[in-house]
Amino acid sequence: MLHKMREQVAPYGKKLAMTEGHFAIPGRNRCEVLSTWAAGVAYARILNVQERNGDILDIATLADFFGNRWQVNAIIIPTPIRNNKPYLQPVGWVMMLYRRHVGEEAVSVSYPSDLDVVASRTGNRIFLHVVNTRMDRPIKVNLQVDGMKIVRGKVYEIAEDPEFEITELTPDAFRPREKELTGEEWVFPSASVTAMELECVAEIKD
């Protein structure tokens, strides 16, 4: 779809805005499947597509802002409220994770076929958005940055059972877990979405 949009806007030199970007499930239902972590993983892959096209896509969203019934919202307001507070849907958690950990400039990246990865940078800090598309196994990688050495890093990870559904009773189920990266190897859990910040220094060649 985006490649067609590129062709359409090319003569005008304009950038695009994307709204109402959420999934829509056919039939008379509230799209309950969108409360599962499987939907969160799928949405992360769409966000990666948006990032890869950031040169023409100026602003985008993958959800309606908030609501109390339909699951296409980023925030659900329980109704009746009682003692429960509004909570983020999987798409909301993923959008927040990506927005908080992203660089100013896109950089190219290569990765195994079962991962979906985009990369960006701000100075010597490299940011990775990584989706493990496999629901059945983790994937181990060796991280390398051309011309630079990774000194340390922080990892923000969401990894849950793809069939798990978030509700007002488990509002923080998809809260990212922060971990330290001390080497160049990392294992991405099955069905996970991860944001990484890598502190790097330029390699000095003899």
Ranges and model annotations:
Residues 114-149, 155, 191-197:
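Carbohydrate-binding surface patches
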Residues 12-14:
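A short helix->loop->beta-strand "cap" motif at the edges of active sites that frequently abuts
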Residues 148-190:
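Acidic, Ser/Thr/Pro-rich beta/coil linker or hinge segments at domain junctions
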Residues 16-127:
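Aromatic/acidic polysaccharide-binding cleft in carbohydrate-active enzymes
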Residues 31, 36-39, 75-76, 132, ...:
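Composition- and surface-driven signal marking solvent-exposed, interaction-prone regions
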Residues 196-205:
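Short beta-strand-to-coil "C-cap" segments at the C-terminal boundary of structured domains/repeats
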Residues 23-28, 66-72, 135-138, 162-166, ...:
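Flexible loop/turn segments at secondary-structure boundaries
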